Amino acid sequence: MTLEEARKRVNELRDLIRYHNYRYYVLADPEISDAEYDRLLRELKELEERFPELKSPDSPTLQVGARPLEATFRPVRHPTRMYSLDNAFNLDELKAFEERIERALGRKGPFAYTVEHKVDGLSVNLYYEEGVLVYGATRGDGEVGEEVTQNLLTIPTIPRRLKGVPERLEVRGEVYMPIEAFLRLNEELEERGERIFKNPRNAAAGSLRQKDPRITAKRGLRATFYALGLGLEEVEREGVATQFALLHWLKEKGFPVEHGYARAVGAEGVEAVYQDWLKKRRALPFEADGVVVKLDELALWRELGYTARAPRFAIAYKFPAEEKETRLLDVVFQVGRTGRVTPVGILEPVFLEGSEVSRVTLHNESYIEELDIRIGDWVLVHKAGGVIPEVLRVLKERRTGEERPIRWPETCPECGHRLLKEGKVHRCPNPLCPAKRFEAIRHFASRKAMDIQGLGEKLIERLLEKGLVKDVADLYRLRKEDLVGLERMGEKSAQNLLRQIEESKKRGLERLLYALGLPGVGEVLARNLAARFGNMDRLLEASLEELLEVEEVGELTARAILETLKDPAFRDLVRRLKEAGVEMEAKEKGGEALKGLTFVITGELSRPREEVKALLRRLGAKVTDSVSRKTSYLVVGENPGSKLEKARALGVPTLTEEELYRLLEARTGKKAEELV
C-alpha cells in the first residue's frame, strides 16, 4: 500500500468510526456490532503505526467517543477526564500489554492484577461535595457528558450521601440493565407494537436518557462502581493501596460493586481467570463483553500514566464475538395467546453459543420497517441477552436485487379470521382461534404461572385435538380415563399429571392473575394487584380509580384490565375455575388498614426499602416516589434527601421509622415483626 492509498483509507476509516461513535455514544443506537467496530478501529491503528506521518491528534484512536447532543440534557464538564480502555483479543495481546508495563517501569513482571467483569452498560460519573451527591453524568466524550442526576436517582442503590470521604469525590461506574429486565421490557414494547431495543446496553442507555424519570424508574436499571476520579490520592493516603482494596472501600461506603472480581498474577494468571469466566458467562445476570484487567498497585498507575485515549495500566480483554452471518429464507406468522400475530424468520441454520439457530423473532411491523429486512437478505444474528436469537443488522451490501419484501397476511394464519390492525400490531379477534387457545393453556401451565409440570406443548395439542379441553378451566375436569391412551401417556404419567393439576390449585391469586394473561399484567403487576385487592371477588368489582392506585398501573393498562374484568366470558372462566377449587386469595393477603393513605420514603431504613414499601401496599396504602400535597406521610430514615425539605414546605406530616411501626400497630393490632 502506498502512502496516498493509506491516507485515503485512513480518512475513510476516521469518518466511518466517528459516525459509528456518534450512533453508539450519543444516539445509543449502533448500526454495527462491537466486533465490527473493533475491526475498524484496529485497522486504523495498524495503518497509523505503519505510516506514522498520518497520525493526527483528532484521530478516533486517541479519543473516547462522541460529544453528547447539547439539546438533550445539560452538558457537564468532568473535573477529571474519563478515559476509555484499549482492547486485547487474545493471550498474545495480553502478554504484549504486560511487556509494555515492564518496559515503562523498567522492571520485569509478573505483576499482580485485579480482574473484573466488563459489564456492558453506560459509563457514568457521580460527583460528591462534602459527602453529598451534586450530580451524576454520562461519560460523553470523556471530558463533557450529560447530566442525568434525576434518572440515576431512580436506581435505589446509588448513595445520595456519604460519610468519611474526601471533600470532593468522583465515583465512576456502569449503569446496566439486567438480562431479565431487558427481556421483560422488550416483551412489553413488542406487545404495544413499539420499537424494541437491540441489546441490554442500548436499553440501559435509552432508559437513562428518558426525559421523564418515572419511565426510567420502571425500567429496572442497576449500577456497579469500580473507580475514582477526584479523591483517589486522598483515599490512597488513608491506606487504600490496591484496586482490590479500592473495590472493598467502595462497598464499605455503600456503592454497589459487582461481586465477581478476582486477583491474578501475570498474564497467564489473568488468562486462567478469563477462561473460567468465559465458560460461566451465560450464567451472569447481566451482559459482559469481556474482563477488565487493572494493575493492582495504585502507586504504579501514576508512574505509567495515560495515552491520549486510555490508561497504560489497564486493558479490556474482550470475549470472542458471538455473532454469525446467515440468510433469511422465509417468514412465517404465529398467533399468540392474546391474538397478536408475530412474524418469525426462518434462517439457514447456524451454530451460535452452543446451539443451532434456525428461527428468529422479527417482533412486529415497526421492527421490520426499521431494519428494512427482506426475504433472501443476508443478516448478522446474535443472542439478545445471551438467550433469544435476534437479527443485529441486515447486510444490505450483499443484496442481489432478488430479495422480496415481507407481506403481512390479511387473515389469521391459524383460523382464517380477518385480522384487525391496532397501530403497528396485527391481531386475530376470533375467541375460538385454536392458536390462541393453545398459547393461553401453555402460558397458564408455565413455571412462573400455575407451574403444571408435565403439561407440555405436544400434550396440549393432543388435548385440544381430542376436544378434551377448550380452555384452562377444562384442565381441572380431566380424569385419568381421559388421559390414558393418549400418545405417550400411560397410567402412571396420567396420575402424575393429575396430581400436578391438583397442586396448581393452591398457587394463590398472584400466580393465577399472571396465568390468566390479563392485558399488560406481568409477574410484578400480578403481585401488586393481588396485594392491593386480596381476592378475586374484590378485583372483579374494582373501579378504574382503584386500579390506577396500584403501583405500576398506568391509565391505558388500567382501562384494558377493567375491560377484561367486565367481559362476561372472562367472568365465566373465573367462575368455573372457582368451582373447580382453584384458590383465589392472595398468598400475602392485602388489607384496608392504610387504605386512602399515600406514603413517600426518604433516607436509609433499618429494613430494606422495598420490603417496607411492599408492607405498606399490602395494607392498602399507595407508595409514591415524590412528595406532593396529596402525600399523607413522609417516612424519614437516616441521611434523608431533598424530599424532607419539600415535605416541610408543603406541610406534609413526617414519621420516623419507629413512628411508622407504631402507626401500623395502632391500625392493625400487630407489631411490625408480625406484619413483615
From Swiss-Prot:
SMART domains: BRCT (SM00292), HhH1 (SM00278), LIGANc (SM00532). Thermostable. Residues 589-676 form the BRCT domain. Its cofactor is Mg(2+); Mn(2+). NAD(+) binds at D34, A35, E36, Y37, D38, S84, L85, E116, R139, E174, K294, K318. It is an enzyme of class 6 (ligase). GO terms for molecular function: DNA binding; DNA ligase (NAD+) activity; metal ion binding. Pfam families: BRCT, DNA_ligase_aden, DNA_ligase_OB, HHH_2, HHH_5, Nlig-Ia. It catalyses: NAD(+) + (deoxyribonucleotide)n-3'-hydroxyl + 5'-phospho-(deoxyribonucleotide)m = (deoxyribonucleotide)n+m + AMP + beta-nicotinamide D-nucleotide. Keywords: DNA damage, DNA repair, DNA replication, Ligase, Magnesium, Manganese, Metal-binding, NAD, Zinc. Zn(2+) binds at C412, C415, C428, C433. One of its GO terms (biological process) is DNA replication. The active site is at K118 (n6-amp-lysine intermediate). Its EC number is 6.5.1.2. One of its GO terms (cellular component) is cytosol. Belongs to the NAD-dependent DNA ligase family. LigA subfamily. DNA ligase that catalyzes the formation of phosphodiester linkages between 5'-phosphoryl and 3'-hydroxyl groups in double-stranded DNA using NAD as a coenzyme and as the energy source for the reaction. It is essential for DNA replication and repair of damaged DNA. NCBIfam families: dnlj (TIGR00575), PRK07956.1 (NF005932). HAMAP family: DNA_ligase_A (MF_01588). This is DNA ligase. It comes from Thermus thermophilus (strain ATCC 27634 / DSM 579 / HB8). The lineage of its organism: Bacteria, Thermotogati, Deinococcota, Deinococci, Thermales. The gene is ligA.
